[in-house]
Design a protein with these regions (language model features):
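A short, GP-enriched loop/loop-strand-helix hinge that lies immediately N-terminal to
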Residues: 1-28, 42-50
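Residues within well-ordered alpha-helices
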Residues: 2, 31-32, 57, 192
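ATP-dependent carboxylate activation and anion-phosphoryl transfer catalytic cores
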Residues: 9, 13, 39-40, 73-77, ...
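Short gly/pro/ser/thr-enriched loop/turn and capping motifs at secondary-structure boundaries
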Residues: 21-25, 33, 86, 154-156
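Structural element of the ATP-grasp superfamily
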Residues: 33-37, 61, 122
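A polyampholytic, Gly/Pro-enriched intrinsically disordered region
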Residues: 33-44, 66-70
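Short acidic loop-to-helix transition motifs that present clustered carboxylates
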Residues: 49-56, 127-129
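Short amphipathic alpha-helix with an adjacent loop that forms part of the alpha/beta core around
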Residues: 56-71
């Protein structure tokens, strides 16, 4: 609504991001799933529209349970999701169809409170998977989307929020997989670009995928915005005749102001492996609950392969606010291959100083 409002007012403003029509079409999980299925893009088995009726929801859940049994899955699971949710919010698992109604009611009420929409999605819960993303960029013409590779966001907290990201999503030349990883990467990029062209995508966006242990990709959703982890994709990407790695935020602004893309997929090159660590104020000994207190020392060793993005000062103590996301910093590490990136990542952590005390005075 905001994106539409700023462009429809008497004194129009420019919204830096996809057009409101694109956000309306792809920002909704239901619309995204319908579009994907119409283009033969694989999606997670389950409903392709918001369910508001409890009896209908239970019928769909029962059919998803039965489908998993037919597939030989020993412990079938159903995911109940707020259709307007995101970021891991408004999601709960169901292990037994007899418990479905209570979970459905809980998620429906949560969705109504948080998003003013009690629509609920019913999907198969796929376990033991990789969470991959495809980074897409296109200009206002919507005709020439390009991709800036893939990234793997499988390492997440108990709340399904990302903690470590790696680009590219798979490295088949350096690791062994139980499936054709190169083909999976090729397929999810192809599917993502196909959808972007179909809707005339016109800014920066991310296509999120689940890849099963058997190498089956399923589209989860499209994020019609720049994401926190854009930097790790940018770190391994370059544009011909442009100096250094690409700056995706600068591209978003430039395109948002109406400039043409100015390059094609052939101009985009990739080099090395990037790893991004999120430094989070959380307590792993107590279920990753927010850690509230005072940072007294924050320092790291500067390296040419390291990019640190942070709002936390290094020359004065810092009180961690409770009103905002507990993300303190992003550390982006580059290596010529996965082994070097991992080695450098360990070196960064060994040389990181992050000291402080919680509100009880405990170090």
């Amino acid at each position: 609504r905001f994106a539409r409002r700023v462009t429809k007012r008497d004194r129009k403003m420019i919204f830096i991001g996809p057009s409101w029509k694109i956000i309306r079409e792809l920002g909704d999980k239901i619309n995204t799933k319908r579009l994907a299925r119409s283009l033969d893009v694989p999606t997670v088995p389950g409903s392709d529209r918001p369910i508001y009726d409890e009896m209908e929801a239970e019928r769909i859940a029962r059919s998803v349970f039965e489908f998993q049994v037919q597939q030989g899955i020993k412990r079938p699971l159903v995911l109940v999701k707020a259709s307007a949710g995101g970021g891991g919010m408004g999601i709960e698992e169901v292990y037994d169809i007899d418990n479905f109604r209570s979970v459905y009611r809980r998620i429906r009420n949560y969705a109504l409170r948080q998003f003013k929409d009690e629509g609920v999605l019913i999907e198969q819960r796929i376990t033991d998977f990789n969470h991959l993303e495809v980074q897409i960029v296109s200009d206002r013409s919507g005709k020439n989307p390009v991709h800036f590779g893939t990234r793997n966001c499988s390492i997440q907290s108990t709340g399904l929020q990302k903690r470590v990201e790696v680009a590219p999503g798979f490295v088949p030349a350096q690791m062994d997989y139980s499936f054709d990883a190169a083909k999976v990467l090729q397929d999810i990029v192809h599917y993502s670009l196909t959808m972007a062209r179909k809707v005339g995508y016109d800014n920066v966006g991310t296509w999120e995928w689940i890849v099963t242990r058997q190498g089956e990709p399923f589209l989860m959703e499209v994020n019609t915005r720049i994401q926190v982890e854009n930097g790790v994709s940018a770190r391994i990407s370059s544009i011909r005749n442009h100096e250094g790695p690409v700056d995706l935020i600068a591209e978003q602004i430039r395109i948002g102001l109406g400039e043409p893309l100015g390059y094609t997929q052939d101009d985009v090159t990739f080099d090395g492996v990037g790893i991004e660590y999120r430094l989070i104020a959380e307590d792993p000994e107590h279920g990753f609950t927010p850690w509230v207190g005072r940072i007294e020392r924050f320092a790291w060793k500067e390296e040419p392969w390291l990019t640190m993005l942070t709002h936390v000062p290094t020359d004065t103590p810092y009180e961690i606010p409770t009103e905002f996301d507990p993300n303190l910093a992003l550390a982006i590490i580059w290596g010529k291959d996965l082994a070097e990136a991992r080695e450098r990542g360990v070196s960064f952590l060994d040389n990181l100083h992050l000291d402080g005390r919680n509100n009880a005075g405990e170090a």
